[in-house]
Amino acid sequence: MSSRIDRDVINALIAGHFADPFSVLGMHQTQAGLEVRALLPDATDVWVIEPKTGRKVGKLECLDARGFFCGVLPRRKNFFRYQLAVTWHGQQNLIDDPYRFGPLMQEMDAWLLSEGTHLRPYETLGAHADTMDGVTGTRFSVWAPNARRVSVVGQFNYWDGRRHPMRLRKESGIWELFIPGAHNGQLYKFELLDANGNLRIKADPYAFEAQMRPETASMICGLPEKVTPSEERQKANQFDAPISIYEVHLGSWRRHTDNNFWLSYRELADQLVPYAKWMGFTHLELLPVNEHPFDGSWGYQPTGLYAPTRRFGTLDDFRYFINAAHAAGLNVILDWVPGHFPSDEFSLAEFDGTHLYEHSDPREGYHQDWNTLIYNYGRREVSNYLVGNALYWMERFGIDALRVDAVASMIYRDYSRKEGEWIPNEFGGRENLEAIEFLRNTNRIIGEQVPGAVSMAEESTDFSGVTRPPETGGLGFWYKWNLGWMHDTLDYMKLDPVYRQYHHDKLTFGMLYNHTENFVLPLSHDEVVHGKKSILDRMPGDAWQKFANLRAYYGWMWAFPGKKLLFMGNEFAQGREWNHDASLDWHLLEGGDNWHHGVQRLVRDLNHTYRHHKALHELDFDAYGFEWLVVDDNERSVLIFVRRDKAGNEIIVASNFTPVPRHDYRFGINQPGRWREILNTDSMHYHGSNTGNGGVVHSDEIESHGRQHSLNLTLPPLATIWLMREGE
C-alpha cells in the first residue's frame, strides 16, 4: 500500500464520507514515481493504458476488495494522459479516469457566482456535455456549500454514489466533476452527504430537462442556442402597441378525444397557434411550463425552473412550439414563479441539509396558504439563480415577456399572516425589502440584456409604482394586472340590471387610478375556478340575457384603456368552470350556428378591430387617450366615452347595461360629422337582437352635455357599440 494513503481515508472514500476525492484519486507524484489510484467497485483487474500507443504501462493493485486500486509507474515523472482498462465481471472496458482532469470552473465564473452577479449561471452550473483534452463527456456542477460530500449518480454509474464523488471549490461552495462518456439523454441526480450527515438525493436545480412525474431525475441536455428577437416582436410589446393576450393552460386547451391525453408541444404548434392567430390575438400567455410534480398546481409549484415540463414533449419540442408562435406573428408570455417552491424532498428544500434556498424561520420562509417555501432573496446565490432563470427563458427560447405570479406575496412579509406570524423588516415595516430589490434588479437586467422583452406583475394590492422606475421608488415592471378593475366590473356585471344603477361607480372608478400604472385588464384562469363559476355563468338573466351581458362586457373591456387578457374557453363562452384535467368544451361549437359561435365571432372581431384602430390602443396610458362623454347616467346604466390616438382620431364607445333599448339617446360629442358603427355586440352576426343605427349616423348641431354638437343614437339592449368618424 502507498505510504501516502491512510486506511481511514480509503474507508471514508468507500463509505462516501470523504470530501476531497481529488486529493486521493487520479494521478499523483510520489518519490517512487507517478502513482495512479482509482475507486472502481466490483472491478477485478485494472491496467493503466497510454492512449497514443494503446500500451499497458502499469497494473494497479487492489488494495481493498471493495474496489480501491493503486499502482506506481516507477519510470514516469511527468503527468500524461492515460486511460484505465478495467475488467468487470470478466469483460474488459477502456475508460477515461474522471480524476485526471483539473478544475473545471473558471476563476471569473467562481467569483461572479459567489458575488451573485453572474448573469447566466446556467452556463456554468448544472450538466453540460463537453469535450476535455479530447475526451467527450459531461461537466457537472452544483452549489451545496454545507454538504460534506457530493456525488453525481445516474444511468452511467448504476446510481452508485461511491463512483463519482465531486471536487469542492471552497471559494464558491460549488462541487464539480467531469464524467467521461456521460452524454445527452442520460438521467442523473446529485447524492449529498448533507451538513448533518444525512444522505439526500437531489435533482439538479439547473437541469434543462427532467423526467415527467412521478419520476424526478434530471436529464443531461444541451443548452439551447440563443434566440435573437425580431424588430416586430420587440415593437409588439410596446406601450402603444395593441396587446390582446390569449391565456392558455397547455394541458387542457384541447386533448385527444380517444384517451383524454394531452396534446404534445408539436401538436399544439399545429393546432393552438393557428387558432390564436385566426382569433386575432397578439400574444399567447402560457401558464407555467416549468417542470412540476403536481398537476393540480397548474405549474405554479415548480421544481425544475430551467426545464420545460416533459408532459408535452422535449425541450426541442417546446422550442418548436415557440418558433411556430413567432412565425405566426404571436409573441409568447410565460408565467414565471419566483415567489415560492414546493417542499418535495428531491427538490430545493433543505438542499444541503441547511435552509439553502429558503429562509430558516418559517415566519419568513413558509407559505401557509400553499404549503410551500419562500426563496431567501437576500442570499446572493439564490437571487442569482432566479435572475439567471429569467434571462434563460428569454434568451434561449425567445420568450417575449414574463408574467410574475403572486407579487404581493413576495413584497409583503405579513402577506396572509396574522399578528405574530411574521417578522418586520430592519426598519420595523411589513415590506420584504430583499424581495423588492430582487424584483427591481430582475427588471433592470431584463431591460439591459433583452431589448424589447418586458415583464408583467400580478400584484393584488395598491403598492405604489409597480410599473414605475426603481429610481422613483417603483418595481420596474412594464405592465401590471388590474385586478381591481376585474373585480369591480365582474361584481357589476353579475348584478340584475335593475340594481346596476346603484353600483354605477364600479364601472367608472377604474379611471380614477387608471394612469397610476400601465395596466393589463385580465379575465384570467383564476376567475373560472374554485366555485367562482365561468364568466358566462356569472351573468344574470335567462340564456339570451347571459350571452348579451357577456357580449356587452367584452365590448366594454376591449375599448377600455389597458391591454387585454382572456383565458381560454372564455372566447366562446364556455359554460362550466375550467377543469385542468379535461379539454375545453369544444363540442359547444359543433353542430349548427349558436350563441357560442356568436361570442367567438365577437371576440375575433373585437381583436381585429382593436388592432386596426390606433385610438383603441395607442394611448392606453396617456390621459389624452380617454374622455368621458356620458359618465353620470346611472338611472339608465348608460356609459359613453371616447378613445383617441396621437393624431386626434376618435372612436366613441357606448354601453347600455340594461335590457331596455334606449331610443333617441342624445349625447354631446367633440367632432361633428358622419359616424359609422364599426362594432355592435347586439348584431345578429353575434346572435343579438340586431338593434342598431343602420350603420351610419350624422351629428346634429344641437348642444348636449356641454358640447355644441351631438349624436342621437339607438342604444341596443345589453350591448356595447363602437363608432368611428369617417367624414364631415
From Swiss-Prot:
UniProt-listed Enzyme Commission number(s): 2.4.1.18
Disulphides: none
Known pathway: Glycan biosynthesis; glycogen biosynthesis
Transmembrane segments: none
Catalytic reactions of this protein: Transfers a segment of a (1->4)-alpha-D-glucan chain to a primary hydroxy group in a similar glucan chain
One example of a Gene Ontology biological process annotation: glycogen biosynthetic process
InterPro entries with a match to the protein in the record: A-amylase/branching_C, Branching_enzy, GlgB, GlgB_N, GlgB_N_E_set_prok, Glyco_hydro_13_cat_dom, Glyco_hydro_13_N, Glyco_hydro_b
GO cellular component, one term: cytosol
MF annotations from Gene Ontology: 1,4-alpha-glucan branching enzyme activity; cation binding; hydrolase activity, hydrolyzing O-glycosyl compounds
Stored SUPFAM superfamilies: (Trans)glycosidases, E set domains, Glycosyl hydrolase domain
Enzyme class: transferase
UniProt keyword annotations, A-Z: Carbohydrate metabolism, Glycogen biosynthesis, Glycogen metabolism, Glycosyltransferase, Transferase
Pfam families to which the protein is assigned, alphabetical: Alpha-amylase, Alpha-amylase_C, CBM_48, GlgB_N
Record has Nucleotidyltransferase as a keyword: no
Active site per UniProt: 405, 458
Entry-linked NCBIfam families: branching_enzym (TIGR01515), PRK05402.1 (NF003811), PRK12313.1 (NF008967)
Function per UniProt: Catalyzes the formation of the alpha-1,6-glucosidic linkages in glycogen by scission of a 1,4-alpha-linked oligosaccharide from growing alpha-1,4-glucan chains and the subsequent attachment of the oligosaccharide to the alpha-1,6 position.
Quaternary state and interactors: Monomer.
Record family assignment: Belongs to the glycosyl hydrolase 13 family. GlgB subfamily.
Identification of the protein by name: 1,4-alpha-glucan branching enzyme GlgB
Organism: Salmonella paratyphi A (strain ATCC 9150 / SARB42)
Lineage: Bacteria, Pseudomonadati, Pseudomonadota, Gammaproteobacteria, Enterobacterales
